[in-house]
From Swiss-Prot:
Keywords: DNA recombination, DNA-binding, Transposable element, Transposition
Additional observations: Tn21 is a transposon encoding resistance to sulfonamide, streptomycin, and mercuric ion.
UniProt KW Isomerase keyword: no
Record organism: Escherichia coli
Start-end of Polar residues biased regions: 674-695
Gene, per the UniProt record: tnpA
The name this protein goes by in its record: Transposase for transposon Tn21
Region (Disordered): 672-696
Length: 988
């Protein structure tokens, strides 16, 4: 049987942990009348209490309380109170071992508890094997088994038996998964898969290593190379649907494990496992390369459009003087002609009085050269880049397997025409080429007097293909990011079942009429209230006039007395090196235990080495430089540990450990209760090898960059971060982190800046149970939408933008609920859906319906904002915390000029995760020592007003040494449960 450990010490402890909250104690240990009747049949208070406690332990956690074990203290009193006996009676219980045995036997007989037998073990392995086909996480399997045994009233065996059954189930499931992926393969498939482990013709890399490389730059050369990779993956010609034979979680896990292994390691696997691993790598690799090719096309087109736009603007600016001179000249000529008309003089003589006829004719020619096309746009300049697109467009269109929804059929028809022309080497478009997809701004360029312009037709088709791929109207077989919109959602039959059984995981009434009645009734009441207040000039610190809305800025939030306390606590915080800080925080929380080995699940053998790799990510130093700065380590050791122990899920669970510690720390309660949060973006320039992976956003200048989008709780804990494209709005990612973080925070209200909101976000936030509160710049320009009806809101007229079109919501209500359910259940991420909805053409029904729903919620929010200074202050304070956290992150991420230089997106994600983990550790460490500083100030005669503690911040770093050699030993000896000394206090 498998011997390896699949549970950590903390996980083993959690499996049999007894509840300590009042609600859980009541839920698990409340007796009914029958229970109490049986308990009271025991003779004497000691026997009654002992019998009752044994019953409680058998029910939950499902074990027998040992002879020498004492009951869990929080459990004893509520149990003793029910049969009305004193807790001190426990000391007299079980003095005769026979009594305990008799009670245990009677409990089994009366309440149906059964001992765990070999038959139960075999059933457990069989049951767990089915679950292990979906996940190989030991804690999930062990928890499922224990829950099953409790429901069956089977007394739990020793945890070793639970772990052994779980491990055996994983082993069996692995064999079944390997067989499921390997059995459909023919000999030809196996030969082609084995060839992936051989070296390419150039001898430098294996085929597998080359196929898994990411594109270097968004240009036609790298696009063609990447298309060759996709062709190579497609040439494997794996059996159709093989990737659906096993659960996606397991397929991804096998692919990740295979990706960390060398070809030599893979070649040593027994055949079934080797072929299964290569199939997983192939299916994931094909999807990744497909998505990267589409992204390259998107970015190449973006570059060409930006270049055309810039050239257009530069040329216009360069010709500004000449245009001005011509305007002034023709102004004089025009005036001369007007005067000639009025006086009856010859018009030609009037012109020649201003300038000679030859000069006039020459000026007209110059004016024609200066003149821009009728639409005054830049699109005509795209034609200058046609050759760039032609280098890869034929191969690009040929390699992708495209399908289209009816809305994009014209685009796909145009693509088919271009494919046919490329195959036949035809230059002229057929007379019946589809033109319905051509937008008005392209019309004059494509449809010329001489017929359809081939170059602009193809440019227009490729541009519309990009837009249709973004919206999901065209999808790609084998892609992950560009699948059919339907494939992202929960299946219709599952949604119908959930709705009929009232089990939709949404925070609103799921009946359309009930929902609309509740929201529109509230909206009408709020509109009437705010209209009345505005008319009477009673809005707090706000006024609405004919010219619009004016809101008085908030006063400074930090009083002078608080600043004095801030300065005092900062002066006594201990000086600490970042290495010492991380060791100390790990001593408190054990966050490093979450960085388990990808394959075995074992903990890292060298914790200091693990912390070194995390710190290398956080301070942006990289493994090579970190090995030089950390005596006793090498690049090879760090690289191995990073490959096997640091990944997205280990960073995520370790971060949750720190966030939970902050959440439960009493001092953090001065800043909030963990129910509100804010999010903000932070831009980092890309340089060196990473420059080509960055995106340009004019907001941050002309340099390419990456954005780390981070959510922070009201207690300053950064509970999630994500690397996102600079060019996308913050609003795209707001929901992801609220839904998919792993901490115990229960966020109810969330704040963002202006870029963080759209109507779609407002709608989904409400459906999923979050109060959305963005700080909207130029709020007066953000319009209110009112229900149709006779009600007039004259005082709000400058802010009203129109009426709500509720019929769209009614028509698409089930689609809205299905979308929200899919996002909530994690079938698809909110960011992916918001990107697609934002790219839809305006007439798309679901996008319009969700927008109307969002307008209701946005209007309600603005009305609340106008009525409440406290809401404004709360949002402002929440966003200030995020901005202050960004300053700390910038200070930590100081190496390499604060630039991202990793080409791989995976490495960029690890940089963001490491940075967020270390900032969370700094926040927790500062919180602990700020509490100690406040106590020390009080103990030395300083008056510390509790109401001022909310103004302290755990985001300071002046006392933390972030530079130098990174040595993992503490300069101060700190005993278990002890803390390092504060700096000397100034006398009161």
């Amino acid at each position: 049987m498998p011997r390896r450990s699949i549970l950590s010490a903390a996980e083993r402890e959690s499996l049999l942990a007894l509840p300590d909250s009042k609600d859980d104690l009541i839920r698990h240990y409340t007796f009914n009348d029958t229970d109490l009747s049986i308990i009271r049949q025991r003779r004497g208070p000691a026997n009654r209490l002992g019998f009752a406690v044994q019953l409680c332990y058998l029910r939950f956690p499902g074990v027998i309380l040992g002879v020498d074990e004492l009951p869990f203290p929080p459990l004893l009193k509520p149990v003793a109170d029910q049969p009305k006996v004193g807790v001190e009676s426990w000391n007299e219980y079980g003095q005769r071992e026979q009594t305990r045995r008799e009670h245990l036997s009677e409990l089994q007989t009366v309440f149906g508890f059964r001992p765990f037998t070999m038959s139960h073990y075999r059933q457990a392995v069989q049951m767990l094997t089915e679950l292990a086909m979906q996940t190989d996480k030991g804690i999930v399997l062990a928890s499922a088994l224990i829950g099953h045994l409790r429901r069956q009233s089977v007394i739990l065996p020793a945890l070793n038996a639970v772990e052994r059954a779980s491990a055996e189930a994983i082993t069996r499931a692995n064999r079944r998964i390997y067989d499921a992926l390997a059995e459909p393969l023919a000999d030809a498939h196996r030969r082609r898969l084995d060839d992936l482990l051989k070296r390419r013709d150039n001898g430098k890399t294996t085929w597998l290593a080359w196929l898994r490389q990411s594109p270097a730059k968004p240009n036609s050369r790298h696009m063609l190379e990447h298309i060759e990779r996709l062709k190579a993956w497609q040439a494997l010609d794996l059996p159709t649907g093989i990737e659906r034979l096993v659960h996606q979680n397991r397929l991804l896990k096998i692919a990740r494990e295979g990706g960390q292994m060398t070809p030599a390691d893979l070649a040593k696997f027994e055949p079934q496992r080797r072929y299964a691993t290569l199939v997983a790598l192939a299916t994931e690799g094909m999807a990744t390369v497909t998505d990267e090719i589409i992204d390259l096309h998107d970015r190449i087109l973006g570059k060409l459009f930006n270049a055309a736009k810039n050239k257009h603007q530069q040329q216009f600016q360069a010709s500004g003087k000449a245009i001005n001179a011509k305007v002034r000249l023709y102004g004089r000529i025009g005036q001369a002609l007007i005067d000639a008309k009025q006086s009856g003089r010859d018009a030609f003589a009037a012109i020649e009085a201003v300038m000679s006829w030859d000069s006039f004719a020459e000026s007209v020619t110059e004016a024609q050269k200066l003149a821009q096309p009728g639409g005054f746009g830049f699109l005509h300049r795209i034609g200058e880049s046609y050759a760039t697109l032609r280098r890869y467009a034929p191969e690009f269109l040929a390699v992708l397997k495209l399908r289209a929804a009816p809305a994009a059929k014209n685009v796909l028809d145009a693509i088919e025409v271009l494919r046919g022309m490329n195959t036949d080497n035809a230059r002229k478009l057929p007379a019946d080429a589809p033109t319905g997809f051509i937008k008005p701004r392209w019309q004059k360029l494509v449809m010329t007097d001489a017929g359809i312009d081939r170059a602009y037709y193809e440019l227009c088709a490729l541009s519309e293909l990009k837009n249709s791929l973004r919206s999901g109207d065209i999808w790609v077989q084998g892609s992950r990011q560009f699948k059919d919109f339907e494939d992202y959602l929960v299946p219709p039959e599952k949604f119908t079942s959930l709705k009929q059984s009232s089990e939709l995981p949404l925070a609103v009434a799921t009946g359309c009429e009930q929902y609309l009645h509740e929201r529109l009734t509230l909206l009408e009441a709020q509109l009437a209230t705010v209209n009345r207040m505005a008319a009477a000039n009673d809005l707090p610190d706000a006024i609405i006039t004919e010219s619009g809305l004016k809101i008085t800025p908030l006063d400074a939030a930090v009083p002078d007395t608080a600043q004095a306390l801030i300065d005092q606590t900062a002066m006594v915080l201990p000086h600490v090196k970042i290495t010492e800080l991380l060791l100390e925080v790990d001593e408190w929380t054990g966050f490093t235990r979450h960085f388990t080995h990808l394959k075995s699940g074992d903990l890292a053998k060298d914790k200091n080495l693990l912390l070194t790799t995390i710190l290398a990510d956080a301070i942006n130093l990289g493994l090579t430089k970190m090995a030089e700065s950390c005596p006793g380590t090498t690049y090879a050791k760090l690289a191995w540990l990073q490959a096997w122990h640091t990944r997205d899920e280990t960073y995520s669970t370790a971060l949750a450990e720190l966030v939970n510690a902050q959440f439960r720390h009493p001092f953090a309660g001065h800043w909030g209760d963990g129910t509100t949060s804010s999010s903000d973006e932070q831009n980092f320039r890309t340089a060196s090898k990473a420059k080509s992976t960055g995106h340009i956003n004019p907001k941050y200048g002309s340099s390419p960059g990456r954005t780390f989008y981070t959510h922070i709780s009201d207690q300053y804990a950064p509970f999630h971060t994500k690397v996102v494209n600079v060019g996308l709005r913050d609003s795209t990612y707001v929901l992801d982190d609220l839904l998919y973080h792993e901490s115990d925070l229960r966020i109810e209200e969330h704040y963002t800046d202006t870029a963080g909101f759209t109507d779609h976000v407002f709608a989904l936030m409400h459906l999923l149970g979050f109060r959305f509160a963005p700080r909207i710049r130029d709020l007066g320009d953000t319009k209110l939408y009112i229900p149709k009806g006779d009600a007039a809101y004259d005082a709000l007229k400058p802010m009203i933008g129109g009426t709500l079109n509720i019929k769209h919501v009614r028509a698409h209500w089930d689609e809205i609920l299905r979308l929200a359910t899919s996002i909530k259940q994690g079938t698809v991420t909110a960011s992916l859906m918001l990107r697609k909805l934002g790219s839809y053409p305006r007439q798309n029904g679901l996008a319009v319906a969700l927008r109307e729903l969002g307008r209701v919620e946005r209007t309600l929010f603005i009305l609340d904002w106008l009525q409440g200074v406290e809401l404004r202050r709360r949002v402002h304070a929440g966003l200030n915390k995020g901005e202050a956290r960004n300053a700390l992150a910038r200070a930590v991420f100081f190496n390499r000029l604060g630039e991202i230089r990793d080409r791989s997106f995976e490495q960029q994600r690890y940089r963001a995760s490491g940075l967020n983990l270390v900032t969370a550790a700094i926040v927790l460490w500062n919180t602990v020592y700020l509490e100690r500083a406040a106590h020390a100030l009080r103990g030395n005669g300083h008056a510390v007003d509790d109401s001022l503690l909310q103004y302290l911040s755990p985001l300071g770093w002046e006392h933390i040494n972030l530079t130098g050699d990174y040595l993992w030993r503490s300069s101060a000896k700190i005993g278990a449960g002890k803390f390092r000394p504060l700096r000397p206090l100034q006398p009161a």
